[in-house]
């Protein structure tokens, strides 16, 4: 992913890079434009866009997004209790869906990011964005109802 972002951002015609999870069942042709428009309209001054969405399964109407609901949210809340509200922790807590794999950024930002290439991509990338960009240059975009291919959760 890091090589892709740098390769595409070196293209003189490319102004932004947008990436989407490959397992989206409800992908809409509107998603790319929703993600990149805040970056292309210079009046907004946005450098990074992170998606959020409702994680309701279309198969069984069950709420998905277990990793965020059952791990990341409680982990950030526990860290807040242990170390207090620091600026970085508040930043991470400000994202409606921090593990969303859909994000977009400007060519200039892409050239300065150290993009993680393994587990932890989403939080690692948010950390890099925090290191490189003022929070006023970050936006979240609602992509509406979103359904991924799901893995069954079984307790053995």
Give the predicted meaning of each segment.
Residues 11-25:
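Short beta-strand-to-loop acidic/aromatic patch adjacent to the donor-nucleotide binding site
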Residues 139-155:
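Active-site donor/metal-binding and catalytic loop motifs
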Residues 25-53, 57:
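Conserved donor-nucleotide/metal-binding helix-loop-beta segment in metal-dependent transferases, i.e.
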Residues 100-110:
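Conserved beta strand-loop-helix elements of the APE1-like EEP
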Residues 109, 118-135:
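A short, conserved alpha-helix in the catalytic core of glycosyltransferases
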Residues 1-14:
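Active-site-proximal specificity loops/subdomain of glycosyltransferases
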Residues 57-69, 80-102:
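A recurrent flexible, glycine/aromatic-enriched loop bordering the glycosyltransferase active site
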Residues 69-79, 156:
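Catalytic core of nucleotide-sugar-dependent glycosyltransferases
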């Amino acid at each position: 992913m890091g090589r892709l972002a740098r390769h595409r951002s070196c293209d003189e015609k490319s102004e932004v890079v947008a990436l989407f999870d490959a397992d989206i069942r409800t992908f809409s042709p509107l998603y790319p434009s929703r993600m990149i428009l805040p970056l292309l309209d210079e009046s907004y001054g946005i450098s990074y866009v992170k998606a959020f969405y409702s994680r309701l399964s279309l198969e069984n109407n069950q709420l998905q997004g277990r990793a965020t609901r059952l791990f990341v949210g409680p982990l950030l809340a526990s860290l807040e209790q242990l170390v207090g509200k620091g600026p970085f922790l508040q930043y991470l807590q400000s994202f409606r869906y921090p593990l969303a794999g859909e994000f977009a950024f400007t060519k200039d930002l892409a050239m300065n990011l150290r993009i993680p290439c393994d587990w932890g991509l989403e939080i690692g990338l948010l950390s890099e964005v925090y290191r490189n960009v003022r929070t006023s240059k970050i936006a979240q975009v609602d992509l509406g109802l979103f359904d991924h291919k799901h893995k069954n959760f079984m307790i053995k």
